[in-house]
Amino acid sequence: MSFFNFRKIFKLGSEKKKKQYEHVKRDLNPEEFWEIIGELGDGAFGKVYKAQNKETNVLAAAKVIDTKSEEELEDYMVEIDILASCDHPNIVKLLDAFYYENNLWILIEFCAGGAVDAVMLELERPLTESQIQVVCKQTLEALNYLHDNKIIHRDLKAGNILFTLDGDIKLADFGVSAKNTRTIQRRDSFIGTPYWMAPEVVMCETSKDRPYDYKADVWSLGITLIEMAEIEPPHHELNPMRVLLKIAKSEPPTLAQPSRWSSNFKDFLKKCLEKNVDARWTTSQLLQHPFVTVDSNKPVRELIAEAKAEVTEEVEDGKEEDDDDETESALPIPANKRASSDLSIASSEEDKLSQNACILESVSERTEHNTSGDKFSNKVLSEKPTPEGPEKTVDVDGPANDVNLETVAEPNDQAVGFHENGREKKRPQLESQPDTEDQQTVDVNLVGEGNDSNIVILETNTDCLKPEEDRNEENQEIIENKLTQSEEIKDIHIQTMDLVSQETGEKEADFQAIDNEVGFTKEETQEKLGKDDKTHKVVISDITSEVGTDEPPGDTQKSAEQSQDAEGGAGEEAPEPAQTLTEKATEGPEAHGAEEEPRSGERVEDKQLEQQSAVCEGEGQVTSTSESTRATTEEPETDEVDQVSESNSIEELERLGVTGAEEQALGSKGEAATELDLEREENAQELPVKAEPQAPAASQASEPPPVLIPSINIHSENTENKGEMGALPKPETILPPEPENGKGNDTDSGTGSTVENSSSDLNLSISSFLSKTKDSGSVSLQETRRQKKTLKKTRKFIVDGVEVSVTTSKIVTDSDSKTEELRFLRRQELRELRLLQKEEQKAQQQLNGKLQQQREQIFRRFEQEMLSKKRQYDQEIENLEKQQKQTIERLEQEHTNRLRDEAKRIKGEQEKELSKFQNMLRNRKKEEQEFVQKQQQELDGALKKIIQQQKAELANIERECLNNKQQLLRAREAAIWELEERHLQEKHQLLKQQLKDQYFIQRHQLLKRHEKETEQMQRYNQRLIEELKNRQTQERARLPKIQRSEAKTRMAMFKKSLRINSTATPDQDREKIKQFAAQEEKRQKNERMAQHQKHESQMRDLQLQCEANVRELHQLQNEKCHLLVEHETQKLKELDEEHSQELKEWREKLRPRKKTLEEEFARKLQEQEVFFKMTGESECLNPSAQSRGCLQTSHPSSTRAPAWAG
């Protein structure tokens, strides 16, 4: 029987192998049938080419996998079988498969639209809800088909969902899928991509006790929906290995901006992302959800049309801006100005995808102060160029912005309000410099709005110098004109776009990146109405267009508020063109010179007032707009306006008390707008931010009614970088604007901001604005602008017969390549993990096969041993019965012969006696008859005696035989019981050893994963250290140059101040100059020492952080190993308990078996005794039939004997 089973198993194995190679063509060159026409990508297991059939011209994606041996084909047969067996419009089809020269060619259906994640990266924005609905429904239908066919995909993500040009999707990549044989079958393989992995799959890394089923794909679908809504999956900032812990322990992820999405979408996600597997909906249930009740795929067709549109690229260098900057820097700098540095800054953060954001900068401006004796403090907004953060957008909050969107124009004509001793001083309006009339228009693809195509068009116009009255009169006209132009653009050019027109009277539209936070408010200022000031005019025009129902809830509100804001700006009275710049004082110590009174007869010139508004867009896109203004304070009788050049470095960051962090220098790679936060992110340091988010600044006019004024608050989130590979900053949060009320004069709202009234020495008032980040050696603004280029992309495509043109503008910097490098490294990590999982799966399959073979072998051996033992005893019993039968037959033969001989002898004697008696008594018939009867009786008695003797002998022999046979049966049963007990022990030992082998390979695989994780962590730490070293090297190289430039400027200004104010002799002046030079040398030496100490501190902190990250990683790894060992110990204990229970139950069943056997033996003995007793009572009455009767009575005993063995 066992041999038959073995043959059956072997036969089934052969059929299965034949079925696996059923769809693979062997020894045929695929290039004879398919022509390679391009390369699509490089996957984890081989390259993917675009191929075309030479006969039918059908396109295919050809995955070419190099296999070292034919055994490796087994790893890919499941994928081929699934592709070949699936016939569904939303699943890619297998077109062909070849195995040729150790290369496996898998040719699948080609989807020209590309993968969903690739489309999002191409368009640099996520999908809208209407697009997500279409993709979700078709993906659900594909999953439902797979699950009905007992297939678990196990690697569902946006990268495996492909678009066709018809607007449909197809599910692809079944490389790690599982094809079950039973509907309720569960799996315990730890496989898939970590970010999309379900919690029950994650738990299989250390415990196989709770296997998963088809609902694991439902969780992955929910994560994929979040990925499509936010470009990246949840926890994408974490290392692929470390995200597993987050998935297992944290709550189910949600949308970053829930109010931005419909309730149906949120409910659908809730049903998908349910950690309790039993409560999680199935695909068939989800198909009934109202979120997927869509029929048209038009949104996806529009998306694909835009993604596949013809792209026109235009690269612009920033050299014109550089020329302007150089011209400005050449202007003379007054030496008797004093600068203060009360600043409120919050750093913006780099966008994860380094998405496009355009940077707007304005020129330096001058201002006149006409009130003598006023105490005020200029708030200097330090700026850093932002080559990254490329798209010009306006006030977009986060990846899914749900706050009320209001456009903020950079006000160049502003009055700056400050608190001093509990009262507010009005800052004079800032004057603009005249320049040529110029206009630059940038059409920008606004990311993250959730609309189909959100476009922000920023128009930066430079007006000629006009009188105050003319400029004020033009305000409303320009607003109305821009409204009209934007409406035309909305109706004709782009259907679903947000149009924001921003017009400023700047000198030139210089692009400049900034990481500061400014709260802008409009305030009525009556001081300057009568003056002939050349104020900067600001016009804000917001138009939001809504198209169809694709716009998610919240956009309508944004649009309404934008329009209201635009109308409010247009409705202001003509004499009120200026906006008031109201900034909150920051926590901590104020800058030197804040709130310091100007000395008599001395003009105080503030530092270059650099205003910036960092605006978060899309997936954390950073859009920075900046305006550099120069304010000059003069005495009342002074009408002189001093023009001061832009400074080349940023000094005030340390003095602002805004962040406790040290400033970052801009490296040659062109770091993004938020250098401070980027350094903290890259160094994995958690540094406190002292600047609390500003409340919207409020101001009110004295006469006109209050209007809604936009206010932007941008504060960086210092995410604690715990060493995750490629951890990227989160988008900043922008607080929604609040309506202005009667509290406009109270600019200090008490939110933790304080104003320091004490004055501090400004080093002889020698324009400290010239060195803003001197200890960090910041590169000059002009140098930074020379490093950047603006890349304009124009997409033209046709949707439903309407030609649509979308223009995006992107700042191309070295940081783009850095971001791409980070993305490439992340892909490498995922690929390494995929290969590792494949190896683990293969090793697990090999171990499972080996263990199954061991179990089959031991069970086969048990069966053979049992059969051998039974056969041995059966043979002994058979021999005993055969011997007994032979003995009985011999005895019966002897008995028959004896009866015959005895009867013959007695009859002979009786015949003689009868003959003799007849001769004697011829006439005595009666006596003769009696004599004959007597003889017959004697014969019968003799024969009966012989028969009785033979019966007794037979009975003894049969009883002895039965006893011997029962003894053999007892021995046989005892041997079987002993064998069963030994088999139970051996089976337990085998299962125990197999369990240890299972956990051994799990530990081995876990250690390999830990080694890979540690290796990735070390590479990440090494990259951080190298980046810090490079940055510090650049800072050290730049510092001497900056110091030389500063020394020359300071010396010139000092000499000029001596010429103006000094009454000393030339010798005294020379001595003062020597003292000043010595002081400068000492100051520069201190700067070098401070920079060196700062660099050492940065490196030390980074190394400590790296060590902490490694320690934390090792702690997590040790916890996993400990958890695995605990599971192993628990399983071994459970196995021992199961064995003890099984042995106990077997012994309990053994007693009744013994009792039944003994009862059977007693019954056989009793039957035998009864049989011989009955046969012994029978008598042979006819002498002639005696021998036959004896034979008949002896035969049953011999024939029944074998039955007792039964």
Curated annotation (Swiss-Prot):
Protein name, entry field: STE20-like serine/threonine-protein kinase
UniProt keyword GTP-binding, yes or no: no
UniProt GO BP: apoptotic process; cellular response to tumor necrosis factor; cellular response to type II interferon; cytoplasmic microtubule organization; intracellular signal transduction; positive regulation of apoptotic process; regulation of apoptotic process; regulation of cell migration
Region feature Disordered, mapped onto this chain: 308-352, 364-440, 515-761, 773-792, 1079-1100, 1181-1206
Record-level Gene Ontology MF annotations: ATP binding; histone kinase activity; identical protein binding; protein homodimerization activity; protein kinase activity; protein serine kinase activity; protein serine/threonine kinase activity
Native species: Rattus norvegicus (Rat)
Biased composition (Acidic residues): 312-328, 634-643
Catalytic activity reported: L-seryl-[protein] + ATP = O-phospho-L-seryl-[protein] + ADP + H(+); L-threonyl-[protein] + ATP = O-phospho-L-threonyl-[protein] + ADP + H(+)
InterPro entries named in the record: Kinase-like_dom_sf (IPR011009), PKK (IPR022165), Prot_kinase_dom (IPR000719), Protein_kinase_ATP_BS (IPR017441), Ser/Thr_kinase_AS (IPR008271), STE20_Ser/Thr_Kinases (IPR051585), UVR_dom (IPR001943)
Subcellular location: Cytoplasm
Domain Protein kinase: 34-292
Role according to the record: Mediates apoptosis and actin stress fiber dissolution.
Coiled coil: 468-492, 825-1037, 1077-1151
Cysteines joined through disulfide linkages: none
Binding site for ATP: 40-48, 63
Domain UVR: 874-909
